[in-house]
Design a protein with these regions (language model features):
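Flexible loop/hinge segments that line or gate small-molecule binding clefts
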Residues: 137-182, 198-202, 275, 301-313
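Flexible loop/turn connectors
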Residues: 257-371
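Hydrophobic alpha-helical segments within soluble ligand-binding/sensing domains
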Residues: 170-198, 214, 218, 249-258, ...
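Short beta-strand segments enriched in small/hydrophobic residues
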Residues: 23, 28-33, 69-84, 195-202
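Append "Primarily bacterial transcriptional regulators
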Residues: 20-22, 51, 295, 359
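N-terminal helix-turn-helix/winged-helix DNA-binding helices
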Residues: 5-16, 55-88, 92, 103, ...
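Short beta-strand elements in bilobed, periplasmic/extracellular small-molecule ligand-binding domains
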Residues: 101-111, 217-249
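An alpha-beta-alpha
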Residues: 183-225, 344-364
Length: 371
């Protein structure tokens, strides 16, 4: 009789979890946890069966989650990062997030750690994440360029430092050839004729690193000092391992020790980036060299630490935070244009932004010491 009255009461109205709770003699929270299989609390078999039986008898169905995919898309940007141990990438993220927050967007950061496997996994996740845009803070791996070009037909992509890559997507660019030349010209103007250049692995995957070195070598070559540059790059295995928090610093430190042991006539050492330059400085300090009196040192990126008085690192400014903001602005423009029609057709545009690299001369470079 009780069961009949229960059924009658449900006629003409939607059954709720509260109805199931009353029928089963349990709390509404218990109904929710049991039916959603969230056993945060240990329920007896008898309670589980009672709840399930009541739900079935009353014809109760769990409410389908209304996924407003478009509203989700309007709030999410995905950012690919090769590592988070270098302040350069943190600065880029800061610029991206500052602009995204202004526009009401959140970020999903994919730290690939320069792993092809991780990069592929994250790319395949894009369909489920359903972002409104994707930003790469470095060049994508070459083996995924076709995939990215295909994805960019439906999701706006912006790539930072994409110059010279054959990829038709929006980009915030850096001319690494020019940057390398600026570094070399500064040292040549100070009379340095024998210098060392320390870099992470110079592989096909990391083409932009090689471009920076190439520009440096060209400037020395045109000055008649083609043999005046010693290139020291880390083993390729460095990029295949998960980067340690001090991996780039260690590259600078360890390879400087090798330079000092093998090339006693060097008067300046250049790091491909500031993190490597910090390692160079510490290695010189440990070997009792005075900077810049005995050895000049340069870095690149003008990160926060390079400005500290005790370091005062000569470096290259290429406006990292601004580049992050610009990449985000490009995505916002693409989103806006996708929501607008120009007559009967959809406009297609490719944005390219480039900043001129500039030298910031501080206390680690000076005139070459006569040896």
């Amino acid at each position: 009789m009780a069961e009949q009255s229960c059924e009658v009461e449900q006629l003409g109205k939607k059954v709720t979890s509260s109805d199931v709770a009353k029928h089963a003699g349990v709390s509404q929270a218990t109904v929710s946890m049991v039916l959603n299989k969230k056993y945060n609390v240990s329920f007896s078999r008898e309670v589980i069966e009672r709840v399930e039986h009541s739900a079935e008898e009353l014809g109760y169905e769990l409410p389908k989650r209304k996924r407003k995919r478009e509203s989700r898309r309007e709030k999410l940007l995905v950012v690919f990062c090769p590592n988070l141990t270098n302040p350069y990438y943190v600065m880029l993220l800061q610029g991206i997030e500052a602009r995204a927050t202004e526009q009401g967007y959140g970020l999903f950061v994919c730290n690939t750690q320069r792993s092809l496997v991780l990069e592929e996994q994250y790319l395949k996740m894009l369909s489920s994440l359903n972002p409104r845009g994707v930003i790469y803070t470095c060049n994508p791996s070459r083996c995924y360029l076709e995939m990215i070009e295909e994805l960019s037909k439906t999701i706006p992509f912006a790539i930072i430092n994409n110059q010279n890559e054959k990829l038709e997507v929006d980009a915030v660019e850096l001319d690494n050839l020019k940057l390398g030349r600026i570094m070399a010209r500064h040292l040549l103007d100070l009379g340095h004729k024998k210098v060392a250049y320390i870099a992470p692995p110079l592989t096909v995957r990391q083409k932009q690193r090689s471009k920076r070195v190439e520009g440096f070598l060209k400037e020395f070559s045109e000055a008649g000092l083609a043999n005046g540059v010693v290139i020291k790059s880390a083993n390729e295995s460095i990029d295949q391992d998960v980067p340690g928090i001090d991996s780039e610093y260690r590259i600078g430190y360890d390879l400087t020790k090798e330079v000092l042991a093998d090339h006693g006539d060097v008067t300046a050492i250049v790091g491909l980036n500031d993190m490597i330059a910090f390692g160079i400085l510490d290695a010189l300090y440990d070997e009792k060299y005075k900077v810049p009196n005995d050895m000049s040192v340069m870095g690149c990126d003008n990160t926060l630490f390079s400005k500290m008085r005790k370091l005062s690192l000569t470096t290259i400014e290429h406006f990292v935070i601004y580049k992050g903001r610009d990449a985000c602005d490009i995505i916002m423009k693409k989103i806006k244009s996708a929501d607008q029609k120009y007559g009967e057709i959809q406009p297609i545009s490719i944005y390219h932004v480039e900043y001129e690299p500039q030298i910031v001369v501080r206390g680690t470079t000076s005139y070459a010491k006569t040896k």
